[in-house]
Regions:
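N-terminal hydrophobic alpha-helix used for membrane targeting or insertion
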Residues: 2, 9-10, 40, 163
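Short hydrophobic targeting helices and cationic amphipathic motifs
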Residues: 4, 12, 17-18
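Intrinsically disordered, low-complexity segments enriched in serine/threonine/proline/glycine
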Residues: 7-8, 20, 31
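Residues in and immediately flanking transmembrane alpha helices
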Residues: 17-20, 62-64, 85, 187, ...
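Metal-dependent de-N-acetylase/amidase catalytic core
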Residues: 23, 30-33, 37-44, 131, ...
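Active-site rim/loop-helix segments in enzyme catalytic domains that contact anionic ligands
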Residues: 30-156, 183-184, 191, 300-301, ...
Length: 323
């Protein structure tokens, strides 16, 4: 007999989908069960600014959404100290609110389940006057931020958490701060003595299983520039300081080819109009060049430690059972 789609949809939790509708009743039940399992795999991504979810990790987020995993994003600031790369896209006074709108667009482009904005202020790069702003994220009380992140973990109960590597990709103070706060929250969320007030209010300790850091290999900026220049783009070579950015290649556990999700990642990036200059080259270069530069992402598995000889799976949820 035919499967009654509407009847089954009424019993699915938020975020679950039916893969097929024209199937037998028995198969329909099996498909729902599989989709429920996939939907019970959860990833929490914790970053500092609008566009942090786009440029370095957009492919991984898109691939997990496409696989039916539940993906939630937490962003700590509005990126008020970012550049305005499109003339007329914003003013210094309006940039934060414009970037709020851009972030909402990016979340929809990636298909994320939900998003939380903590609304600290962008601290700017090290040495900027913005470092001294009382609302700057780097001046936030560590206890308060970590308590909030532990609450996020205990509420959403992710098996996998994603943030920046401890150096913040290129030394951005906010990137370094979110890495520190997220790592500490990962380690504390399972401890019933940590933030016991949360347990008194009905939350339970939760032990996420894996923590991944977004990273880039040292020398990546020069590789990118050479690739784009070879494709005919007048792309600037990195500065001496930029050549120092990145992690030693041996520290990176995963180099992922996520080019199958390049269109989704590019759509997410282009939501951040204030951050994409008219000279942005990736929509002009040949597809294989865009795939090489934008379709590759790099990750370090920070928890659990990777013992010598272990090959880290390309699937960040590999062998994790839904719960």
């Amino acid at each position: 007999m035919g499967c009654q789609t509407a009847q089954f949809k009424a019993h699915l939790k938020p975020g679950f989908h039916l893969v097929k509708t024209e199937v037998t009743l028995g198969l329909c039940s099996l498909i729902i069960k599989e989709e429920e399992k996939m939907a019970d795999l959860r990833l929490l991504a914790c970053f500092a600014h609008p566009d942090d979810e786009a440029f370095p990790v957009g492919g991984l987020l898109a691939s997990n959404v496409a696989a039916g995993r539940r993906v939630r994003l937490l962003t700590t600031t509005l990126g008020e100290e970012g550049e305005i790369r499109q003339e007329g896209a914003a003013t210094k006074e309006t940039l934060g609110q414009i970037r709020r709108i851009e972030l909402s667009c990016a979340v929809k482009a990636l298909g994320l389940e939900s998003h939380e904005l903590l609304e600290y202020r962008d601290s700017g790069m090290a040495g900027w006057d913005a470092n001294d702003h009382p609302r700057a994220y780097i001046n936030a009380n560590d206890y308060i931020v970590i308590e909030r992140l532990v609450r996020e973990i205990r509420e959403f109960r992710p098996q996998v958490i994603l943030t920046f590597e401890p150096g913040g990709l290129y030394g951005h103070p906010d990137h370094i701060a979110i890495s520190k706060h997220t790592t500490t929250a990962f380690d504390l969320a399972a401890d019933p003595t940590a933030f016991a007030n949360q347990l008194a209010n009905g939350l339970k300790p939760h032990a996420p299983q894996r923590l991944f850091y977004s990273a880039r290999p040292k020398g990546f900026r020069l590789e990118w520039a050479n690739k784009l220049r070879a494709a005919g783009e007048d792309f600037p070579l990195p500065t001496t300081e930029q050549l120092t950015h990145g992690n030693p290649p041996e520290e990176i556990h995963l180099t992922l080819d996520l080019s199958a999700h390049l269109e989704t990642k590019m759509a997410c990036i282009l939501c951040h109009r204030t951050q994409v200059a008219p000279s942005w080259p990736y929509h002009r270069v040949p597809r294989e060049v865009a795939e090489w530069v934008m379709g590759r992402e790099y990750y370090i598995r920070a928890r659990p430690d990777v013992p010598p000889g272990e090959n880290v799976s390309d699937d960040v949820f590999d062998s994790i059972a839904p719960d």
